[in-house]
Amino acid sequence: MSIIQTIDQQIAEALSSNTEYNDYRERWEYLFQSYMGGMEYKDGRYLTRYQLETDAEYRARIYSTPLDNHCASVVQVYNSFLFREQPEREFGTLDNSPAVLSFLRDADLDGRSLNSFMKDVATWSSVFGHCWIMVVKPNTGAVTLADEQVLGVRPYLNLMTPLAVTDWRWKRSVTGVYELVYFKYVEEFTPSGQTVKVWTPDTIQTIEVDQKNNRILTDLTEQNGLGYIPAVCAYNLRSSVRGIGVSDITDIADSQRMIYNINSEIEQSIRIDSHPSLVKTPETQAGIGAGSIIQMPDNLDPGLRPYILDYNGAELSAMLAVKQNLVEAIDKMANTGAIRATEARTLSGVAMQTEFQLLNARLSSKADGMELAEEQIFSMFANYMGTEWTGHVEYPGSFNIRDTENNMQTLKTAKETATDPGVYKVIDYEILELLGKEEPAKYLTNTDGLPGAYVPADTPGVPAGENCANCSYYNPFDQGCSKWDETVSPVYWCRAWEGRIEEEIENMREDT
């Protein structure tokens, strides 16, 4: 084999990709453009082309058609709930480590905090179905961890979409665990080519390819000290193919594309209605615009007089109805009908609650995936630091999704119907909770209706074991005190305290 053939083979191997990548690449590009919108989507040329339509006419129609980007809207809704509360992290052996503190502030050495980085992970895994995270540490030649700390060297993260990862291979170990044994991705695009990184459990190879001149500029191989490939596949939802996830917008993107084409038809319909086509002979001179003058030859046959071409296409209202049906279908697919609604919808309380529960289940599943990915990241981070990860990461597992306006209206109706003062107190408590306020018993310390000795039960001087919860005047149903006719806290105490016998306590427990 000649040297030229050898070089060509090396370049082809460096730029090659596996079967899964080749099969999914076109779909991934479509999902990426559907999420990004703007010029990315216009460059995809997703409008259906008319017969005999010229390139110039097609481009003009693309640039005049707006895109309703439902893909980005759905992903943003998911992230707004998923990261409403910050995850809780316990670092175990890495607690108070300067490297970890620096890592939390700047996870990718590009200014993004770990929380911001994980938001991007959630975004791209939602778009593509999965994304890849590399945990890497620069090789500066430092001998000890102390030397690395002096130089400020620590592990950092590199987020890659599936479009950048061109080849990967899994192998089942003797213990039955699947391990990543080959991982190749495009690290950087250069003016003349690209830089490719190839990881194996033993080596790290960096290849810089000059595609214009068909040559390899750099081929550097170094040892992989970890003994495994520090890559994390963050799934949105696992598919039947290892290393491939299920996107949240894979079906939404198709409906979005249909809406995009309907928008084009609506725009064309409005143009035709406003500016209908004029049929005339070549000799007839007609101006353009409202009130234009038409000059006909003197000897023109009356049967050849100019006339307006009638348009018998679909009605505008019919196209708008189809578009609205597609939007409702998108909301059903994403379980965001009550969240993204822009107008009041007639839904029963059960239907709305069911929709919220489905969205809550979807968000909980996404949170579990984020927990798993982040714990794998910290496990690799700890290996780089010469220790084992003993901490844990916890994302919110339940998302309190309620229709505040509908619940408030229900409570208002209940209060107008009720006659029992005790029920009034329960409704007032529910209203305060709905508004995000603390329950009255938690902040009520003294009112005109309570004695001055109304104090927390752990206050010095209060008899041990005495509190409002075990007082005979206390009603646990509405947290009311029949002695003072006030709402009280079960962990407070006053001088009017009177104990109740165990039978009374047990009966009240059974009643409540």
What residue ranges belong to the model's regions?
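Extended, charged amphipathic alpha-helical segments
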Residues: N214-T354
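A broad, structural surface signal
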Residues: S116-K119, V127, P138, R257, ...
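Charge-rich, acidic-biased intrinsically disordered regions
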Residues: D8-N18, R25, M36, R49, ...
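Extended, regular secondary-structure scaffolds
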Residues: A122-S239
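C-terminal helix-loop subdomains that flank or include functional centers
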Residues: N299-P302, S317-A318, N325-E433
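Extended, helix-rich architectural segments
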Residues: M1-L157
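Cysteine-centered metal-binding/redox modules
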Residues: L432-T512
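Short, well-structured alpha-helical interface segments that form or flank functional binding sites
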Residues: F128, D254, A314, A318-A321, ...
